[in-house]
Amino acid sequence: MATTTSCSLLLSSTLFLHSPPSSHLSFFNLSSSRSSPISLYPIRSKRYFRILSKLSLNDNNRDDDDDTLHFTPFSAVKPFFLLCTSVALSFSLFAASPAVESASAFVVSTPKKLQTDELATVRLFQENTPSVVYITNLAVRQDAFTLDVLEVPQGSGSGFVWDKQGHIVTNYHVIRGASDLRVTLADQTTFDAKVVGFDQDKDVAVLRIDAPKNKLRPIPVGVSADLLVGQKVFAIGNPFGLDHTLTTGVISGLRREISSAATGRPIQDVIQTDAAINPGNSGGPLLDSSGTLIGINTAIYSPSGASSGVGFSIPVDTVGGIVDQLVRFGKVTRPILGIKFAPDQSVEQLGVSGVLVLDAPPSGPAGKAGLQSTKRDGYGRLVLGDIITSVNGTKVSNGSDLYRILDQCKVGDEVTVEVLRGDHKEKISVTLEPKPDES
C-alpha cells in the first residue's frame, strides 16, 4: 500500500511537467517572492527538449514563436519537483512503519452511549427530582442593639410533594422550633409553608404550600414490607444546601431501630442504607430502582456528622399511615396502654423477659383494667409490678416489641395482655385509648 502511494505521487509530479494536450494549469513561482503565474501549453516533444536546453536563470528569456512555452526558469520548478518527491518518500516510510501501525490501535474512539443501568438511573432522577423540595427553617431573633425582630436561617432540609393539594412531607426535626418555613420547588419558585401537623414519636411532619397544581409533582409511593437487603436504593436531597443531589447505594439492613430525636421513643423497622446521607438530606425520599418511595431519610450514624456509610430511613409503610392522619386530622391519634415501664436493662438483671410496669395510673387504660404498678411495701421493700410478656398472643421481650404491637393497633381496640404477676401468669383485657394530649 505504501509503495503504491509513493509511486502514484511520483507519477503525478512527472505528469505535472508532461501535461496532455488539453491541459492548462496555473500555479506560483516557488523561487520568487513575486508569485508570478506559470502557464503550460501544448508543445511538440522535439521543440520541448530544445527549449529546455536553452533555459537559463534569466527570467526575461522568452520565445515568441507560436509554439512557445511560457515558462519561468526550470530552477523554479525543480524545487517543487523535489518537494513532491520528498513528500512521497516520507509518506511511504511513514505508512510502512510498524510502530505507527501498532500505535494506531490505542486511539481513543468516540464515546459510546450510556449503559442500560446508567440510563435507568438518569431516567429515575429526571422523573423524581421535580417531586423533591428544599425546606428552609427560619427562626425569629431579636437584635440586641436595635431590638429589631429578624428572621435568621436556623437550618435546612429536604422534603417531597405528597399530593396535588400542596402537602409536603418531611422530618419533624427539620421544622422543629421554626417560626417561618419556606419551601423551594424544583423550578426554584419559593412558597411560604404552614405546618399541618407532626408526629414527634416517629419524626414525621406534614407542611402545606399554596402552589399551582401544575407545579406540584407528587412522588410515587411504594411499599417497604417486601424490601430485601442488597437491593439498590437512591436518595435525592439537599445535603449542605446543594439542592437536588442524587446518591446511590444498597439496602444494608432491615428492621433496625433508632430513637426519635424529640421524644426518645423508638422508631422500629427502620431501613439501613449505605447511600450517602448528609446534613440537609433529612426529610428527603429514599427510592427503589423503580423510582417509588420506600422511606424518608432521617438519620445517620457518624461521629463527625458527615456520611459514614450508615444511614437510616423511616419505612414508607410507617410513614403512610401517619401522613394520612396528619392530613385528615392534623394530628396522630396513637393508642396507648397508659403505663410507664422500666428500662430493658433493669428487667434483664432480674433474669426475666418482658416489660416491667413501673406505674399504671388508675385513670389510664391499664390502670382501669387492673394492671399493677411497682411499689414499696410497709417495710420499704420493693414489690415488683406486673411484667408484660405478650399482647394478643405476640411475645413481648422488651419495650420495642410493645411499641411495635401498639403501632399496629387503633384507638378503641381491645387487646389481651398477658402478665407475670409474682410467680404466676394472668391474662387481662385492656381497651386502648389515645394519649391525653391527642384527645
Swiss-Prot record:
Residues 326-423 form the PDZ domain. The active site is at residues 173, 203, 282. Interacts with PTAC16 and other potential targets for degradation under high light conditions. Belongs to the peptidase S1C family. GO terms for cellular component: chloroplast; chloroplast thylakoid; chloroplast thylakoid membrane; cytosol; nucleus; thylakoid; thylakoid lumen. It is found in: Plastid, Chloroplast thylakoid membrane. This is Protease Do-like 1, chloroplastic. It is a peripheral membrane protein. Gene3D superfamilies: 2.30.42.10, Trypsin-like serine proteases (2.40.10.10). It comes from Arabidopsis thaliana. Serine protease that is required at high temperature. May be involved in the degradation of damaged proteins. In vivo, can degrade beta-casein.
